[in-house]
Amino acid sequence: MSRRLRRTKIVCTMGPSTDRDNNLEKIIAAGANVVRMNFSHGTPDDHIGRAERVRSIAKKLGKTVAILGDLQGPKIRVSTFKDGKIFLNVGDKFILDAELPKGEGTQESVGLDYKTLPQDVVPGDILLLDDGRVQLKVLSTDGAKVFTEVTVGGPLSNNKGINKLGGGLSADALTEKDKADIITAARIGVDFLAVSFPRSSADLNYARELAQQAGLNAKIVAKVERAETVANDEAMDDIILASDVIMVARGDLGVEIGDPELVGVQKKLIRRSRQLNRAVITATQMMESMISNPMPTRAEVMDVANAVLDGTDAVMLSAETAAGQYPSETVAAMASVCLGAEKMPSINVSRHRMDKEFETIEESVAMSAMYAANHMKGVAAIVTLSSTGRTPLLMSRISSGLPIFALSRNQETLNLCALYRGVTPIYHGEESRTEAGAKAAPQSLKEKGYLSTGDLVLVTQGGQGATQTNVCRTLIVE
């Protein structure tokens, strides 16, 4: 091997900061592997224009960059106040009124964007406003009104979010706006489509169905934000198996289950997603201080590093790159932390699946290659010629410490591989199912500077024709 590669991928959110000062090119050059379009903000034309710039810059820099479209989901929020803001003290009585018009909120009451809240709560429930900064105990309900008492006081301003401790709000995961945004996502051709606040596999299946009807074959990302989706193993597996990618959305999830529980849930989600052959993104406030500071805190460094040690495929930046003052510096700092964490030998070898049966020939070949990589002395890299990206995904579920090069002439496949941990997507124009194509792959990587003469590599590829089988070859770079 002639260069060291970062295995953990970085997802960056686009916004006003990436629209100025050539920052979009700077964050891609600094190491962004996936760019996130937050459909909560901006118009369809904004998103389409940004996608075009991403693809143009990626081509210019010779990089593979995937696009993730993130649907807004239900707006479970208070409405607006006459004066824009109030201050609630502990013990105050406060009414949430679904019939109160916008702009009519006072010290005593405020309207609701989420009109069915009174039907979702019972006396004793705790409502968490503005990520838990203000907390209300439900005393009673009467028609459209929820009568509460303030248990944690503080300022409350327009359009702040509402969560229920322990979850249980019944809002549909997909709104009419989301359905329109799926059409925009299809026009863009996003690689990944994130669904906010899914309650169960049914929400994810519905999103996939709507995407396919729009002509979009994107991988579905489940943003795990509701307490009920992590309440037990069955609920967690239901969400994971219905998705292609899991996002550990620690903001709303942390509010609903409590931050002390979040630590274990993050680790369990990452571990279980990998076991079930799903990719996983860890998100929310990973380098929050770099919105306004040029360096991360030590705590943020440790947070990113711990997600890497947990086995996450990717770590995500939100406001840090969308609205921050130092977007490219944040990406560079995150990349550096990932590389540092990846030096830990304990994360480089996995015994996962040693006692499991394989369900397909493709999986058996992929796992055989990874077993050989972990037990054969001197292997420098794993090379897989892939038309769909499935084999690189399966390989990346096993830790080896070795780079996995996914070679394909299908750009959509390369974009998917941009998210998978340890996988470096490389364009390869040769036919992927022939022996000549397999032998040409290491030479191509040598020419690009990834391999050196004498390197030992494992090469896998699919078969050609109905009578051919998938194969794994051991080759020496000439």
From Swiss-Prot:
Keyword flag ATP-binding: yes
Cofactor needs: Mg(2+); K(+)
GO molecular function annotation: ATP binding; kinase activity; magnesium ion binding; potassium ion binding; pyruvate kinase activity
Presence of keyword rRNA processing: no
Pfam families xrefs: PK, PK_C
EC number assigned by the record: 2.7.1.40
Enzyme category, top tier: transferase
Residues engaged in binding K(+): 38, 40, 70
Record: residues binding ATP: 38-41, 77, 160
Catalyzed reactions: pyruvate + ATP = phosphoenolpyruvate + ADP + H(+)
Binding site for Mg(2+): 225, 252
A GO biological-process term: glycolytic process
Activity regulation note: Allosterically activated by AMP and by several sugar phosphates. Belongs to type II PK.
NCBIfam families assigned: PRK05826.1 (NF004491), pyruv_kin (TIGR01064)
Subunit structure: Homotetramer.
Annotated PANTHER family: PYRUVATE KINASE
Identification of the protein by name: Pyruvate kinase
Encoding gene (name): pykA
